[in-house]
């Protein structure tokens, strides 16, 4: 019996030892590709040991698969600590996929210990010759060194734009020499060739500009001078090589292609790659004709690691499946570090992707994940995921989770998000994204989920931008943005950007359970329909929610244009889509330019401003059960604890708790680093104390006149024009200030309000006398009766050509606006060096009772000659938001 038991145990041990296991291969910097790669260390007589390269391990797996010797469980390739300089990108194809029952796992031995380097280390530095040294500022001359990159075998330097060579020093990218070192130079003039006007802004499509800065004299003789600018809009940039430069005139001519949006006065730019501007440690310049790189090292380069980017990428996967890349550091690519195209069941985890001239990860396919990675110091985007089929609404099931993406878009500055989702049914969850000049996240397609992410300190170099952005489509519906935390986002120079930006009629999106703190235009609906803003908390946002009706206003041309084109290009008429989104079937017959189906419910708004809803949009918006400017009963708002107490009045409106403890990064065995540091970038916005509180603006005493004493003829003969009694429109609502200041006088006879506006005219430029708001010389004023609660804001416009209108933009109903339009009287004339506009507005037509004492009021001057908008009072929002402007005293 004892003998039988012993045999049984022996048989069991033998059978367990024969159970199949993954193939084990090893790679080490001390290895050799002639060794078998099956042991982690070198054996006796150098006959065994690890491989030297990943490519050799990959090829070994291919050979074993072909010979039928690859286990069904796949393979694990363990890569020892060290830096692996790549001669070419590490490429995996369909032939490198895992077997049906297993995976191929490439595993680094430790976090941040295994680096795949697509760059070339630089060790040979020499003094700068006297002729070149003389061009360098004296402060830098004792410190600069140079390196001949051609001596390293490099001949392709690219251009100093996206995809060009970059320099890295001890783990951080160094900036090309530039002026100014921080900030920008303003464009003072553009060419008169190929002129254009866009949204009232004049410019030129020809790439020639003028500027005024005495520093420009230094740049004469620069062999490879470049500029980087936001040439027309602050959300569109381009880099230009300078082909002609006149330092006396401050004139530059750029190489083609010119910027698609053209160039305008007041745009901003800087120059770079100048030998004469190496004036700070870390700055460098490359002469592409000679391959000489000159730089001021932050410290002794002999005691640092210095490398330049060389290869277009570090790793590529093409139609690969069932592969894991675990724990690698990827660096030194000129383009995107890791590209994965058409992959299935691929995992990229615990990685560090940094110091690349392009993006971090671009992945398309299905059922794949990017988990626990750190991505930073990137020239372009962070993580791009694209998967799923819109025709069948089949989900891609791509996931980005627990990643930290920061300090990206260093070269390509705009529309390079930290994380983007495209296709159908992909997820971005519990990521942290911070420190970027433009957007944090972007999405397009259907049915994505963006949840539990933290975003801050983005859009710091842009204004018409969104921390989370999408736009211009009725059909890309079904995405949910929930339980995210957006904070400290205020735009370039504090002029304001957007938190979640549904641009240009984007539709069918749900924004729920998010926390917005100190975000301008936090939840922004740009004319789209069937959007929901529900159960969010807004703290010190200006405003919390925005809805406009651009589809029946300035963007109405897009309705029969790009919007209809994209509708017809989608499968919206298929049975599946008809069932899922029946609204699309009749959209073209249902006022498609209006934001119908907008729901704003159960939100909490504290501080800042609650809403900015355009008048034409108001009938399309359902506002209900929102808690505005009441104490919601936070646990400890001063310390950032926005949980609700048990006695919170928000519970009465059905507010659902937000899972604050689950937002953002979390400690996990797959996290590349822990803990994480992410300091908030200093705000460019004015401090809260500088923003006027509601109803606390300055006052203007209206003159009393006898009925009939003022005739509306566009002349000033009936007025006492004392400059000391004038209302002055002297501050810009946006853009550059005008050198001219318009003056206004107001009077009241007990039955009507009178307004005379005197606007100086530029003698060198004719008045624009049409009736299109924003495109003509005109003014607008807005007012409401402060003695009546929830009284409408009336918004009237007068044009230099004599036309006038009463509009609904500020919230008056169409019937109310029409009643005022019929009752008011307006005239305009040209008088010497000014034009005059004169209004009479019967108070009864506005529903204002006799004896009213105070009107909230603001005045806005549109001057086309210098493309300015000058106002009486800054509101921190729309000019017509008169509760934050000034007050007329009628008595």
Predicted region positions:
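General beta-strand recognition
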Residues: 115, 251-253, 292-294, 522, ...
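Short, surface-exposed charged micro-motifs
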Residues: 241-244, 283-285, 440, 743-745, ...
